Amino acid sequence: MSEQQYTLPDLLQNWPWNRHLSPYYEEAKRESSAWVESFKPFDQDGQRAFDAYLLASLTYSHGSREFVRLGCDLMNFYFVYDEYTDVSDSAVADRLANIVIDAMRNPENSSQSGDHLLGKMTKHFWTRALAMAPAGSPCFEHFITTSETYLRAVTQEAEDRANKRVRKVDDYLRLRRDTCGARPTLALIEFGLNLPNEVVRHPSLVALTEAAVDLIILVNDMHSYVRELSCGHENHNLITAIMLEHRLNRQDAFHWLGSHCSRVVDQFLSDLDELPSWGEPTDSGVRDYINGLGQWVRGNDDWSTESKRYYGEDGETIRQERLVTTRSGESNYIKFGQVGVQDSVRIQPIEAN
């Protein structure tokens, strides 16, 4: 059995936001757990390993109890949706996207979602989300449009997976910015902040948001690589793209990732210093939004080692020592059956139109 060790770079060593766990973690976990289990999407071991509740409570950690609960539901939904599309071809993935989009745009009278569990989950989630801001708030349409882009991009990812396509770094990042779901995830931060459209769409704020999206991708692809390698899904990972395009070995690819991430962090902090003022109360909402971005980036990294999703019981050791071992021919740290991937997904058929 061949083994290889490599060192993980500390991607966020200069990130000014610190770990913060929501005080509503246990309460939101209890409520959201009961909610997602009521749909019975797959076995509970997969949900425990993913731990959507910890992810939401580390990333939306300064929000109200209702907001943290909403974040838990969103993370749970993404997990279920990703697991379904991971075992779907592009045609099925596209139909699943239609179900979800229709349920958000027409929660009271959705013709396409029917009784499919993804449609039901979307309606339940969106009904609660609509209560988080005044009717007609721009945040609702922003969330829907970014969600639609994400759902359509996942269909493209399914095609890449079927064709065993490996993209170059820039091309990969363009697609990954949509397939990772970070844009709608960060759009949720806007709920209740009453930020006008012209502020949210200002080039300075857009640049900060896009940098946060990239940092989420870089952190996620670093931590998920071992698991994806053992599962045969490493073609849709930035490390693979770096290795192939730049002809680097695995360790040097991680060094490249670390250097690239440092540049993104530096640019984020530089752009933050140049942010214009819109006057109060808008500036207060902008500060809350930016702190939400910063906490999401930090919390995503914290969750990656604190949950069992990527490293099983070894997360804390890996966080401290930064040393990871890959073993060819076997799952690393956790197996498919432990994380609810593929073999534990019971795909609900989609009714023909």
UniProtKB/Swiss-Prot annotation:
Lineage, top-rank taxon, reads: Eukaryota
Q: Give the enzyme's EC designation.
A: 4.2.3.-, 4.2.3.126, 4.2.3.198
EC category name: lyase
Could you provide one GO biological process annotation from this protein's UniProt record? isoprenoid biosynthetic process
Residues the record lists as binding Mg(2+) 2: 82
Chain sites annotated for binding (2E,6E)-farnesyl diphosphate: 309-310
Return one GO MF term.
terpene synthase activity
Q: Which residues bind Mg(2+) 1?
A: 82
Q: Where does Mg(2+) 3 bind?
A: 220, 224, 228
Site feature Plays a critical role in the stabilization of intermediate cation: at which residues? 79
Renumbered to this chain, motif DDXXD motif spans 82-86
Cofactor(s), names only, from the UniProt record: Mg(2+)
Q: Which reaction does it catalyse?
A: (2E,6E)-farnesyl diphosphate = gamma-muurolene + diphosphate; (2E,6E)-farnesyl diphosphate = alpha-selinene + diphosphate; (2E,6E)-farnesyl diphosphate = delta-cadinene + diphosphate
Taken from the record, one Pfam family name reads Terpene_syn_C_2
Which UniProt key words apply to this protein?
Answer: Lyase, Magnesium, Metal-binding
Q: What does this protein do?
A: Terpene cyclase that catalyzes the cyclization of farnesyl diphosphate (FPP) to various sesquiterpenes, including beta-elemene, gamma-muurolene, alpha-selinene, beta-selinene, beta-cadinene, delta-cadinene and alpha-cadinol.
Family (UniProt): Belongs to the terpene synthase family.
Q: Present the record's domain note.
A: The DDXXD motif is important for the catalytic activity, presumably through binding to Mg(2+).
Protein's recorded name: Sesquiterpene synthase Agr8
